Regions:
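A post-motif C-terminal structural segment
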Residues: 1-3, 65-322
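Active-site nucleophile/metal-coordination loop of metallo-enzymes that catalyze phosphate/sulfate
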Residues: 1-79
Length: 322
């Protein structure tokens, strides 16, 4: 999705700001076979090269993941992090803040430091106290935690990362281009986790508020907010919920407000405590207890490390994973 936003060209699944290969009659939009696999200049790159603007990326996924990569790298395979990461490091981005501390190659880190960048890995205070203009600050080995699960002493919020990036980038009198992504809204949707979706979307909303606050004060800044593709099909009013239109707001949403962890956070918590604590965990972090059927389903999950059921007897038909 971001490849199309950044380049103005239609794309194919897995391509990172790269001209798509011609697929004959299957192409909805005509393509030039001679241009297949050519790198496509992104808005971010054009802002730097043609207008001298500063550029930055803020996100919560790992930095070579699709959206940050679509702004600042080129590949016909989004999974080739070993191709993408060095491109991003050598693209002279002024500010990069997000996940993926383990994915920055040694050569790329040396290049950044040799060119005057502050490079911080899992160092929230280092990021906060750095007075230089150019900076990479990466947290977690790969993606950062969902906002609801986040330890604020270890990982900054999307809003804080946005404010830091704007403060540094706005020093350039020629202006700046900054891409901010609430990366895991989409991930929660893929996981059918409404709590993760809602809370990370609210975290993104607060980051948008920081951007709009600056834009109002500055008077010369455009803020554009766009969605990723939709997925999971979350809805209110399916046939599984007759009479939904007569339910109160609390009946529809109150249970969500009791959750203190996302589905991912729950999985980690349950795997870190003995099986005897499962019901206590659900009472404390979700406001309800599991039924006997639900507890049996949990115990049969193939990824549940503390299940009393032998692994060879788990992951049976109809059972899932954490």
């Amino acid at each position: 999705t971001t490849s199309c936003y950044m380049t103005g060209y239609p794309s194919r699944t897995g391509y990172v700001s790269t001209y798509p290969e011609n697929d004959g009659n299957n192409d909805i939009y005509p393509t030039d076979p001679k241009r297949a696999f050519q790198p496509l200049t992104t808005v971010l790159e054009a802002a730097k090269m043609t207008q001298g603007k500063s550029t930055g990326l803020v996100f919560t996924c790992e930095f070579p993941h699709a959206t940050p990569a679509d702004c600042s790298a080129h590949s016909y395979n989004r999974g080739k992090y070993e191709w993408i990461a060095p491109q991003m490091a050598h693209n002279d981005l002024n500010v990069v803040i997000g996940g993926g501390a383990s994915l920055l190659p040694e050569e790329s880190e040396a290049y950044l430091k040799g060119n005057g960048y502050g490079v911080f890995k899992n160092d929230i205070n280092g990021m906060r106290n750095y007075n230089g203009d150019n900076m990479w600050a990466l947290f977690a080995d790969r993606e950062m935690a969902y906002d609801l699960d986040r330890d604020p002493a270890q990982q900054p919020s999307l809003e804080e990362m946005t404010r830091i990036a704007i403060k540094k980038l706005s020093k350039n009198p020629e202006g700046f281009f900054l891409m901010v992504e609430g990366s895991k809204v989409d991930w929660a949707a893929h996981a059918n986790d409404p709590v993760g979706m809602a809370t990370d979307f609210l975290a993104y909303d607060r980051a948008c508020g920081a951007a709009l606050e600056f834009a109002r004060q500055n008077g010369e800044t455009a803020v554009i907010m766009v969605p990723d593709h939709g997925n999971s099909g979350i809805s209110i009013g399916s046939y599984s919920c007759p009479g939904y239109d007569k339910l109160t707001k609390d009946q529809l949403f109150h249970q969500f407000s009791l959750y203190k962890l996302t589905a991912e956070g729950f999985a980690k918590k349950v795997n870190s405590e003995p099986n005897s604590e499962v019901q206590n965990i659900f009472r404390e972090y979700a406001g309800f207890e599991l039924t006997a059927e639900e507890l049996d389903a949990l115990n049969h999950c193939k990824d549940y490390k503390n299940s009393p059921i032998p692994e060879s007897e788990r992951a049976t038909e109809g059972k899932g994973s954490l």
